[in-house]
């Protein structure tokens, strides 16, 4: 992998999961530890990260900004266009699950005025949904490390009380072998459970996430009903069971 691509992958992981250790980065990127350390020195030199006491995290700007704000700024136009298209798959009167991802959070403005009920495991997502006047249930459970999301067995027990018509979620990436992947195990058990029990599943994924590899596999992409993206993937990249929806980005 070219050096600059690897550096960007490190920054992408830190945007989603921070702080993290160099060893975890090495595992997630399938790259030797000495190479990771060289990359971290380069990113530190560029003042893009802070590497201290074995932990790596994104360098903070002088203004106060949440990790969610950082992630929302990445591929913002693509995420907004994808969200608009995904919202059209939601039926009036349905119960919808939206995960804690920033891509899924772009759905919220598109849902205003719809007669739906939304479940979410994202604390910030729940607050934004309620502020938009949408009937919302915020699931309880253990707080995922380095995330404003809850997950775990207690969260799954709560989900079992609901009939979920549509699941809308995102992920760190899609591997070349067609697996939905993530560097953190935190929310995977909840996503896997809902994917098996929802009526319709919709994955929101911009083109920057194709061809990613990471430590944990969530599920085969072919288990998803719809992939909504800003670029048409090859059949090898996206063996989706039903349909790929490609949206133009203004």
Task: Give short role names for the model-derived ranges.
Residues 2-23, 27-100, 108-113, 117, ...:
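HTH-adjacent hinge/linker in prokaryotic transcriptional regulators
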Residues 75, 96, 118, 148, ...:
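Glycine- and other small-residue-rich loops at beta-strand/loop junctions that grip anionic moieties
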Residues 105:
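Internal active-site segments that recognize and position negatively charged phosphoryl groups
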Residues 2-5, 9-12, 19-23, 30-32, ...:
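Conserved phosphate- and dinucleotide-binding cores of soluble alpha/beta proteins
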């Amino acid at each position: 992998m070219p050096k600059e691509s690897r550096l960007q992958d490190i920054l992408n992981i830190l945007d989603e999961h921070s702080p993290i250790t160099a060893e975890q980065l090495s595992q997630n990127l399938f790259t030797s530890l000495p190479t990771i350390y060289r990359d971290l020195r380069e990113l530190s030199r560029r003042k893009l990260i802070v590497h201290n006491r074995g932990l790596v995290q994104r360098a903070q700007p002088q203004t106060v900004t949440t990790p969610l704000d950082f992630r929302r700024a990445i591929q913002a136009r693509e995420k907004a266009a994808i969200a608009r298209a995904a919202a059209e798959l939601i039926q009036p009167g349905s119960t919808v699950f939206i995960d804690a991802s920033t891509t899924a959070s772009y759905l919220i403005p598109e849902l205003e005025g719809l007669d739906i009920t939304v479940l979410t495991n994202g604390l910030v997502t729940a607050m934004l949904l309620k502020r938009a006047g949408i009937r919302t249930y915020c699931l309880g459970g253990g707080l995922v490390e380095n995330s404003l999301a809850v997950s775990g067995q207690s969260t799954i027990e709560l989900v079992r009380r609901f009939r979920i018509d549509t699941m809308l979620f995102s992920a760190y990436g899609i591997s070349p072998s067609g697996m939905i992947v993530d560097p953190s195990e935190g929310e995977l058990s909840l996503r896997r459970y809902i994917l098996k029990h929802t009526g319709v599943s919709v994955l929101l994924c911009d083109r920057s996430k194709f061809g990613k590899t990471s430590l944990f596999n969530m599920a085969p992409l072919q288990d998803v009903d719809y992939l909504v993206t800003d670029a048409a993937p090859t059949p090898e990249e996206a063996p989706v069971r039903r349909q790929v929806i490609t949206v133009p980005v203004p």
